[in-house]
Amino acid sequence: MSETQASQVPQAPLEACPICVKQQGEVIGGPVYQDDLVYANHVYNREGPTFLGYVRVETRRHAPSFAELTPAEAQAVGVLMARVSRALKACTGADHVYAFFYGDHVPHLHVHLFARYPGTPEEFWRERVDEWSESPKGGADEVAALCQRLRGFLAENPQ
């Protein structure tokens, strides 16, 4: 999709999209990474303990799916997914990082990255890693500390 075609994709009002709204405000731990094309933050569960190692990579522009991305956005999403995956492995000791894209709940491109920790039983692999009772969980302070480590890794490893 060319830059001109991308500008012609219908845009939802920013206030109607929870991802657009979130990117304009504050998130627990702050953004892990952001530039003009992409944004990443650690997900925080306000209703209980948060699984440590769940980061979302999102486009800055309101684009519903991969089909609407410009070449520059597609490249930026892919590169950031790889960088954040490396950061999650280095900063959490995860032995694997899952990437999920569903695209049918919130129409703003976002990819879910989940760390899988050593010893995670196979029945809790994939989208169930956070359901394992022994998976690392924490509150706002632990999320903020992990975000700081992730930002540090990304700053020291720009590629």
Locations of regions flagged by a protein language model:
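HIT superfamily nucleotide-processing domains
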Residues: 1-159
